């Protein structure tokens, strides 16, 4: 009888241990899946935020040739400044990584600032041109949208990068492969470049 009781107790203990192990395994697997899915959602948010920036940058790039053509008629002596703007635009359009894109955008913003300063000082009559005023308004609006999109993107990158660094989520993040490494912020270099391009005259 005692032997039978010990066997039953041993069997019960074995079943309890097996159940606890099974519950732990299920909990770990569920946590792993939940954490992996969180990384996928965060990665998608970062990519969506970058796509939004890309749309506004493309609009900005498309606007610049129209702006240059409009100003050419008024500012014949600003050909070097116009060439710098177009060259900076082309560099920015061909940049691939976030870091390269940020550096190129810094250059383009600086060229646009120089361009607008030169035009506003030397050609005040351009203020009467309806096409120029329309392009100026569009550029100003795009600059605001870009700034807002840049803040949103950087916020998503911060959330993603933080999740990659926190324990124990970092264990899952390190095993997720390509696309799941720390992301770069889309930052402007200096306080002067952080200000929007001044497009008012």
Where are these regions (language model features)?
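A helix-centric hydrophobic-segment signal that preferentially recognizes long
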Residues: 2-201
């Amino acid at each position: 009888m005692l032997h039978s009781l010990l066997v039953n107790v041993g069997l019960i203990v074995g079943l309890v241990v097996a159940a606890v192990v099974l519950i732990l395994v299920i909990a770990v697997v569920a946590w792993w899946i939940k954490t992996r899915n969180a990384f996928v959602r965060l990665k998608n948010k970062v990519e969506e935020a970058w796509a939004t920036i890309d749309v506004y940058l493309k609009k900005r790039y498309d606007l610049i040739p129209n702006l240059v053509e409009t100003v050419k008629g008024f500012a014949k002596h600003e050909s070097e400044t116009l060439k710098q703007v177009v060259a900076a635009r082309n560099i920015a359009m061909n940049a691939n990584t976030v870091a390269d894109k940020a550096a190129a955008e810094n250059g383009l913003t600086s060229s646009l600032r120089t361009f607008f300063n030169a035009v506003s000082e030397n050609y005040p009559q351009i203020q009467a041109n309806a096409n120029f005023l329309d392009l100026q308004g569009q550029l100003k609006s795009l600059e605001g949208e870009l700034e807002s999109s840049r803040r949103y993107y950087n916020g998503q990158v911060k959330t993603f990068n933080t999740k990659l660094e926190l324990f124990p989520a970092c264990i899952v993040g390190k095993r997720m492969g390509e696309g799941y490494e720390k992301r770069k912020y889309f930052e402007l270099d200096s306080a002067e470049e952080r200000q929007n391009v001044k497009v008012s005259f």
